[in-house]
Curated annotation (Swiss-Prot):
GO biological process: 'de novo' CTP biosynthetic process; pyrimidine nucleobase biosynthetic process
Active-site residues (renumbered): 383, 509, 511
Ranges of residues in domain Glutamine amidotransferase type-1: 301-533
PROSITE patterns associated with the record: GATASE_TYPE_1
Name of the protein this chain belongs to: CTP synthase
Chain residue ranges for the region called Amidoligase domain: 1-268
Pathway per the UniProt entry: Pyrimidine metabolism; CTP biosynthesis via de novo pathway; CTP from UDP: step 2/2
EC number(s) stated in the UniProt entry for this protein: 6.3.4.2
Leftover remarks: CTPSs have evolved a hybrid strategy for distinguishing between UTP and CTP. The overlapping regions of the product feedback inhibitory and substrate sites recognize a common feature in both compounds, the triphosphate moiety. To differentiate isosteric substrate and product pyrimidine rings, an additional pocket far from the expected kinase/ligase catalytic site, specifically recognizes the cytosine and ribose portions of the product inhibitor.
This protein's encoding gene: pyrG
Function of the protein: Catalyzes the ATP-dependent amination of UTP to CTP with either L-glutamine or ammonia as the source of nitrogen. Regulates intracellular CTP levels through interactions with the four ribonucleotide triphosphates.
Family (UniProt): Belongs to the CTP synthase family.
Amino acid sequence: MGETKYIFVTGGVASSLGKGIISSSIGKLLQARGYKVTIQKFDPYINIDPGTLNPYEHGECYVTVDGHEADLDLGHYERFLGIQTTKANNITTGRIYKSVIDKERRGDYLGKTIQVIPHITDEIKRNVKLLGNKYKFDFVITEIGGTVGDIESLPYLESIRQLKWELGQNALCVHLTYVPFLSAAQELKTKPTQHSVKELQSLGVQPDILVLRTEHDLNTNLRKKVALFCNVAENAVVQSIDASTIYEVPLLMQEQGLDETILQKMGLPVGERPPLGPWKDFLNRRANATETVTIAMVGKYVELQDAYKSILESLSQAATYNDRKVKIEYVSSEHLTPDNVDEQLGHVNGVVICPGFGSRGIEGKFVAAKYTREHNIPTFGICLGMQCMAIEFARNVLGYADANSIEMDEKTKHNVIDIMEEQKAITNMGGTMRLGAYECVLKKDSKVYEAYKEEHIQERHRHRYEFNNDYRKQFEEAGMKCVGINPESDLVEIVEIPTLKWYIGTQFHPEYSSTVLHPHPLFVSFIKAAIDK
């Protein structure tokens, strides 16, 4: 196509309006037209990455194939577009400042006074252009975290102003705002949108397209009013009404010609509207599913759904491909005990023992693992969930009553989960775990091999602790098989009990690899087993 086109997505009025979903939807529509598209997220916080953030603070920490701990929006980008993102797709203010300060310490600025403008803004601009320059994408969509008016966002908005001036028709700004409905007056109010756009204009950025989040349809007069007072064309005012699923949003945007408006404004041919056949097939299959499969998620962050966002989406996708709707029941591992486990888990079709860190709520995960093993309920343990399945097995089948992970009990005599050798000398917490995609070889006579239908796989990891190979023989002899092994480190990646319907734990995070059009085979297999329970 020639020069890379840059689309900036900003937000106003309120946070959590769905900039990530709009960015993903734009990306999906452009991708469907044959363009090579990627999406990046700029987060205005000063952490280097979200790896050390509490899930209650920031939701799930997503992991890219190259081992970067990233914002959960990258999960949306990958699920919608079926692409793989990298460290370059998620930048924080902390990383920007660290890069500039490191350059200053090296003497790269030749003794100049380092300032927000031009040094910080130049570093932001360099990172915006990096993906286009290095990988020759046709479109780079850049989502700016936060809300217009936040102090933290100012350097990013100044960078957008400069880039729009420098790139001309090759840069475009989509601004997402909220149109509230006042029930007392039975009226939609556009004033917050007008003020948000005015705030953006005061910073030198004129939005080219407005996407209005709303719970009610916006009539033509209201759209004309917004267009007039915000200096945008009428066809550039698009509504984003509440949908039953986020996966409907690309179709809703396509119906209003959002992708066509973008192409026109960037001087590109519009051509035929792509049919999005497989995407529509997925949505039709989802809508036509009448039966429900009930899955319990046992974890310590269950009050906040975003803490397990990728798992929820993976279960939802897998259920669709099994022609089912999925009902999720959240079970707090902190409050799960032998006395109430039957009430909590006895009626469900399957159980996911969620990942996590630390000892809080760990005993409840052991209770869940024991109950589902003894009652032959399909069970999927992920990362710490897999470790809990192994510890429970050691305690109640092998007879090691004090079996534990070194993470939870440094004095345990039976450390069936041990710290990885290369982690022993590490003291810093941020970005130091075993992160990213690693190879795994599957045993052919296993349920996981049946699911994957291939022997060599690659999956993403985020952990410091591993299954202790000193116990492997005892586990195997007692019935828990180690069926997935890393060929380089001999690390146990997957355990399963083949005599049970579906009792599998993975040290890796399969949820990071599941997409709308290619659901993860383990989740599909798990849901199928849960249906057959």
